[in-house]
Amino acid sequence: RMLEAASMIVNRPTYYEISISNVDKPVLPQEELERRAARVTSKGNSIIVTNAPRFTEKSSVLPGAKFIIGFDTYIRLMDKHYYPDHVAGKHSPVENSLDLIYENGCGFVVAGRVDDQNQFRGLHDVEFEVPARFRNMFTELTEEQFRSDLSSTEIRNQTR
């Protein structure tokens, strides 16, 4: 449903992307990749499989893409913990990474999420400030446009 809601904003074809490698998880086993891909394609959707664990790599492989992400992923995108090897450049590792994503013509559509206190949180409900030069890279899916109280992991577990 998030992809459907975001497709109205980006006004172009949308695809699922799955990476066989992930910063926080082990390499995705072949059988799990096939299972997830089959679930997506059985509903008439297209999927792109990459070996790009971070959005810096994804933006290089898929220049011009608008990545549709959930709030939890947005928080991780802004976390310097995920960029230990991106120290070159004149800014913080996060800003250097956003620079590369921006240079590749990419952006993000971000869906909000309900927190532990049952409050819906979106782009404007975070404790950090996105540098002004990057703000136009982010578009928010409002609560009215899309709301799911389940994480992507919970959704995957329900469909097993």
Predicted regions and their residues:
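Nucleotidyltransferase catalytic core that binds NTPs
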Residues: 1-160
